[in-house]
From Swiss-Prot:
Residue ranges that the Swiss-Prot or TrEMBL entry lists as coiled coil: none
Family of this protein: Belongs to the bacterial ribosomal protein bL31 family. Type A subfamily.
Key words, A-Z: Metal-binding, Ribonucleoprotein, Ribosomal protein, RNA-binding, rRNA-binding, Zinc
UniProt KW NAD keyword: no
Residues holding Zn(2+): 16, 18, 36, 39
Any GO molecular function: rRNA binding
The protein's name: Large ribosomal subunit protein bL31
Lineage, opening ranks: Bacteria, Pseudomonadati, Spirochaetota, Spirochaetia, Spirochaetales
Subunit relationships: Part of the 50S ribosomal subunit.
InterPro entries reported for this sequence: Ribosomal_bL28/bL31-like_sf, Ribosomal_bL31, Ribosomal_bL31_A, Ribosomal_bL31_sf
Source domain of life: Bacteria
Length: 67
C-alpha cells in the first residue's frame, strides 16, 4: 500500500435510535442509524408501526380509493 493516501481505519461507535450502541471499526468516526438488530421487526418478531398512516391516507385520497 502507498503511504498517506488511505483514510484512517479507527474505532467507531454505531448508535441506533433505540439506544443500542455497537462498537466496530470504520473510516467514519460516528454512525447513527434508525434501525438495528435489537429493534428490527425481523429479529425481534414484533411488528413495529412506522409512520406511514399519513402517506397511506394521502395515497388513497389522491387515487379516490375507498376502504
Amino acid at each position: 500500500m502507498k503511504k498517506d493516501i488511505h483514510p484512517k481505519y479507527e474505532e467507531t461507535t454505531v448508535t441506533c435510535a433505540c439506544g443500542n450502541v455497537i462498537n466496530t471499526r470504520s473510516t467514519v468516526k460516528d454512525i447513527k442509524v434508525e434501525i438495528c438488530s435489537q429493534c428490527h421487526p425481523f429479529f425481534t418478531g414484533k411488528q413495529k408501526l412506522v409512520d406511514t398512516a399519513g402517506r397511506i391516507d394521502r395515497f388513497k385520497k389522491r387515487y379516490n380509493i375507498k376502504d
